[in-house]
Amino acid sequence: MDPQVVNLLQETEEDVYRRKTARIRRKVSEIEKECEMYAVKIYNVERDIQRYRHEAQLLSKVLEKKGLNKEKEAGET
């Protein structure tokens, strides 16, 4: 008989449990790392969105002021 087959036949329930839990722990660890990576990406995107909104507000205010100044200049002449 093949040595691997003999080894599997001699494997106890405890060995099977240990092997399966080790595999599950590895998978959980991989998924946790992926979650951390996505959390960082989401944080960076949210920060970028806030920055772009702030820049858009500032630009809007600047354009409003320039628009009002042009209207005042046109009214004075």
Swiss-Prot record:
First-listed, main subcellular location of the protein, grouped into a coarse class? cytoplasm
Say yes or no: keyword Cytoplasm present. yes
- TM spans (from-to): none
What are the UniProt keywords, alphabetically?
Cytoplasm, Nucleus
What are the GO cellular component annotations?
cytosol; Ino80 complex; nucleus
Q: Which InterPro entries match?
A: INO80F (IPR056513)
Origin superkingdom? Eukaryota
Q: Which GO BP terms, alphabetically?
A: chromatin remodeling; transcription initiation-coupled chromatin remodeling
One Pfam family of this protein, by short name? INO80F
Give the subcellular location: Cytoplasm; Nucleus
- Presence of the UniProt keyword Disulfide bond in the record: no
What name has this protein been given in UniProt?
A: Uncharacterized protein C16C4.20c
